Amino acid sequence: MDLAKIEKFIDKQKVSFICSIDDEAYPNVKAMLKPRKRIGLKEFYFSTNTSSMRTKQYLNNPNASIYFYHKGLFRYIGVMLKGTMEVLTDQESKDMIWKKGDTIYYKNGVTDPDYCVLKFKAMSGRYYCNLNTENFEIK
């Protein structure tokens, strides 16, 4: 499996899907903008509201997955990563992924208490392309 190819694929996507587990043990999926920061295939950083349902779910159960896909005319490519999601509220993490214009979502700026960072740590993945799938480990 060419992990560098998967990284390039992920970087081209504008949307990602994150999955959390609710208090009844059911998966919940949400479309998000692409990650704000990525370190290899191991770490992904997203911004979200501290008050969101998803944040509460990750605090209760950190098991998570993220998914990226592209649908072309004749083929579909998808990458699922499994791991854990951590909710970060420290200022250093918030500063790290803050973007100009984020005040549209977080009125009080980078120090807004309703702004937090989701840090996804991947353990394994599954790649799909042309009716073929391949599992891979992330070290």
Model-derived segments and spans:
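Charged, gly/pro-rich active-site loop segments
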Residues: 79-139
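A short, Trp-centered hydrophobic/proline-enriched beta-strand micro-motif
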Residues: 8-24, 64-68
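A short, aromatic/hydrophobic, helix- or strand-capping loop or linear motif
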Residues: 20-22, 69-70, 107-113
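Short glycine-rich loop/turn motifs
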Residues: 15, 29-32
